[in-house]
Each structure stands twice: as C-alpha cells, then as structure tokens.
Amino acid sequence: MFKGVYPAIITPFKNKEVDFDGLEENINFLIENGVSGIVAVGTTGESPTLSHEEHKKVIEKVVDVVNGRVQVIAGAGSNCTEEAIELSVFAEDVGADAVLSITPYYNKPTQEGLRKHFGKVAESINLPIVLYNVPSRTAVNLEPKTVKLLAEEYSNISAVKEANPNLSQVSELIHDAKITVLSGNDELTLPIIALGGKGVISVVANIVPKEFVEMVNYALEGDFEKAREIHYKLFPLMKAMFIETNPIPVKTALNMMGRPAGELRLPLCEMSEEHKKILENVLKDLGLI
C-alpha cells in the first residue's frame, strides 16, 4: 500500500498562527511534483508545539486540500495511549488514509509495553497504521521481533517508518517481520530500498520533491546507477537539513526560497548565522536560490 516518497510536511506559521493558505500552497506544490502522499503533523510539522485544536485543524485541512489525489498519513502518536487512540480515531473520522504512530517517548516503555500500546491503537481504528521508530528522539527502540508480533496479530499494522540508522535492524525488519519499511532518514533511503524497503518519509522532499521522487523511482526500478547520481547531487542538502534540529533547517531553507514556512515555535528557535550561511551556499549550489 505504501510506496514512493511521502514528504513529512512543515506546518507554516504567520503571526504566530497556522498559515492555512501557505499550507495549501505547499501541499499543491508537492503533489504537482509527483509525491505518493503527504505526512501531516509529524516531527517536521512541529507537532509538539501545536495545540490539540491546531493539530486536528491541520489534519482536516490537509485531507480537504489533498482531496483524494494522493494518500494522507496523519500524525497521531503520543506517549499516552489514550491520547494516541483519540488522535487516531479523529484522523479516521475526517478521512485520512493512514496514521503515523510514534513509539511513546520519555516514559520509555518495554517491548511488551510497546506491543500493548500499539495493539490498543490498532484495535481502535480500521485505518492502516505506520509505526514510527526514531530512537534518537524517543529513547526507545522498537525491535523487529516486536514489529513481527504486532503485524501478525493486527492486520492494519501495515508499515514501519524506520529512522534507526542500524541497517542490520532494517534487514531483520524487512526479512523477518515481513512488513513494508519506509526510510525515516533521507540519507539512508537508497540503502534501505536496496534491502527491500519501499520508499521514504522525507524531510528533503519538502524542498526538492521532483528530484527525490526521481531518485526513489529509479531505485525501486533497480536502476541504482541513476539513483546514486541524484543521491550524491542532493547529499549536501540532506546533510544540511540536520545541521540543527529538524525542522529548523527545512523551514529556514523554504523561507530563503520564498516558499511558505514562517517562524518556528519555541523552544525551537532561529538558525545561527553560521549555519544559515552553510545552508544558503548549499541551496545556491543546487540553483534553488
């Protein structure tokens, strides 16, 4: 069901409020450039600093703007199981195609706790669920054996966004758990596709969707020579997206390009002048500004 490039979109702000017109403009730009779907209110969408009301309004707006043209994956994770259920049910009710559900962060559940958490979410909705593993942010690693148990027990647990850079774990996940894997790290998209992954939930695709779609399509077709050419062309941009905490660099880049992005919400803050210069040079080298 999941294949290709899914930009994890930013949430643009204007005068400290969500810029819904800018959001619509960004979504249309991404769809026009061939993405497979839109991932709303994930980490890149500054979900931690959106109110519940804003979170829900953004999902509703994304579903409305997309209007069935591509898939909508709604961020619906939480470190509180009941809250994750509430957000997932809401996403289903307003017409999202799937939910992205992160491993609970900070409270560090065991593997059994993760199994029970995701099981409760899966029981609450009929939508496909994309599990999200990002140990660098959550302090917990969703192990392949846990994913295998979940996928065997719940038919709507359909995919994993894997942002653990350990390719040995990715291999186990694809081979043993037999579940669709989407890269959660732009730099590792090609290695993960080579192992059998089906695509990427991407930050960089906010900036260069057409090129990223071309790269992934070449890789999925087995033409890794052409895919590598694009990978290495975009590699400096991939690196630049993480010179400060995501989504600081991607929003800064979009602002430099004159695209809707706006300010960040504290505790995220404006990029340092030193890093701005690095990012500006990368964008200039690619002809983006």
Curated annotation (Swiss-Prot):
Species name: Methanocaldococcus jannaschii (strain ATCC 43067 / DSM 2661 / JAL-1 / JCM 10045 / NBRC 100440)
Record's subcellular location: Cytoplasm
Family indicated by similarity: Belongs to the DapA family.
PROSITE patterns found in the cross-reference section: DHDPS_1, DHDPS_2
GO process terms (BP): diaminopimelate biosynthetic process; lysine biosynthetic process via diaminopimelate
Name of the gene: dapA
Pathway: Amino-acid biosynthesis; L-lysine biosynthesis via DAP pathway; (S)-tetrahydrodipicolinate from L-aspartate: step 3/4
Pfam families, sorted: DHDPS (PF00701)
E.C. designation(s): 4.3.3.7
Complex formation: Homotetramer; dimer of dimers.
Protein name: 4-hydroxy-tetrahydrodipicolinate synthase
Binding site for pyruvate: T44, I201
Keywords, in A-Z order: Amino-acid biosynthesis, Cytoplasm, Diaminopimelate biosynthesis, Lyase, Lysine biosynthesis, Schiff base
Main location: cytoplasm
InterPro entries tied to this protein: Aldolase_TIM (IPR013785), DapA (IPR005263), DapA-like (IPR002220), Schiff_base-form_aldolases_AS (IPR020625), Schiff_base-form_aldolases_CS (IPR020624)
Residues under site feature: Part of a proton relay during catalysis: T43, Y106
